[in-house]
Amino acid sequence: MTAQLAPAVRGLLSSSVLSWLDKPPLGPFIDGSWRTARSDTLIDVIDPGTGLPVTAYAASSAEDVADAVAAARTAFDDGRWSEQDPEVREQTLRHLADLLEQDADVVAQLEALDTGKPLAEARLDIEEAIAVLRYYAGWATKVEGTVIPAPRRFVATSTREAIGVCAAITPWNYPLPILMYKLAPALAFGNTFVAKPSEQTVLSTAYFAQLCATAGIPDGVVNLVPGAGATGAALTATQGIDKIAFTGSTRTGQAVMRAAADTLTKVSLELGGKSPQLVFSDADLDAAIDGVMGGIWTNAGQVCVAGSRLIIDRRIHDEFVAELVSRTRRLNLGHGLAPATNLGPLVSAAQRDRVVSLVDQAVAAGAHVEITSELPDDRGFFVAPTVVTGARPGQSIEQEEVFGPVLTVLPFDDEDHALQLANGTDYGLASAVWSGSASRVHRVSRRLRAGTVWANTYGVFHPTLPFGGVKASGFGRELGSAAVDHYTELKTTVIDL
């Protein structure tokens, strides 16, 4: 279909992106080629900055999902990838990373158009995806076994082997980086893969699937089934999958886990968050303000680790909040592709309406809201950066994952009170401590119930750093050496001499 872009937006896109968008509607990518979906359902890809459709794709049916899983199973069982020398897998994945780097500008524009985030942020996302892919390419030749002490008539070893067919369901906020958290280690260790991106953001994943074929990844090793919730449900229910990795809401993660229980499929879940940033009076307040702003305004707050709760020493509350609001007013809210934009829209009208509703409920319950900027004069799904003060612990705005540019501020009286507030939600994905005292940083970090604690910084990710949550934020770790356990099985071999 011809992309229905607003003229101002069309002028911001490269000819390569426009050409790619003007192709016929995409369908599933199975066994090395694009297929015509067996479903008649077309899903529009919406530009969040204008509310206009830019292209469409065909939703994958349950039959398409079964075909993708079957292709992945055949590709695994015949060894076309798993039995290749580790050096070959490493070289192929490095070549794939090089191709992604060559097309980084195109993919970043697709990501910004699809998600609504500022182009500068989208470029960082693609850089992260490339870094993760290169990191795990190196792991293909680094997984080793051990010789186990045994009675002298026996030789016993333990070795790591690929699991088999891995599936991933990825979210709309960071489509390509989060796909790479799952796909890169899976392929490095010899597995095959089926990806189901969010129905709202398929463009970068679809582009990447084509790059896999160009890079020489054998047919059937990487498969893509775009679609909405029904497609994801079909994927989790399909026999023949050995591992499912899911990133998304806690509620959907629970559904994935229930479905996986029926087939005893291995699962890892990275779910919601309500991350606290604890600011003590002895902190570098200038740095802390910048850190709090980055933690909540990045990607318009649509981040699983968004630092959406500012827990601050009561003695510095007013001064800190006033300066934070002042700096936030300098942000430019606009279309993600516009050069001056540093805060974009939310991904959909539904997400915008949900965020606005939660803020309205907080106001009705007596909270004070500071709206820090005017909304752009267009049809996009914009919510202005919002600072909520005066909310009580336990209110929805303080407990629920808003997933928007909304910061709730809670004052504390002492360290124990700060920790009580910080740990007082169902979530435990990330947190931060801002303090000039090394002993306090260590002491507080130990007591925070979160998978990641940042101290005097926020949002630092790297391919080597394991990432995941506790409590309702899920289980399992991605990135770093932790992925070895998720994408390999340990085999013990005992030989009688």
Question: In which residue ranges do the predicted regions lie?
Answer:
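Hydrophobic face of amphipathic alpha-helices that form TPR/SEL1-like repeat modules
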Residues: M1-G49, A75
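Glycine-rich loop-to-alpha-helix module at the N-terminal edge of alpha/beta enzyme cores
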Residues: V54-V143
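Conserved C-terminal structural/oligomerization subdomain of aldehyde/semialdehyde dehydrogenase
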Residues: M1, L52-T55, L278, N332, ...
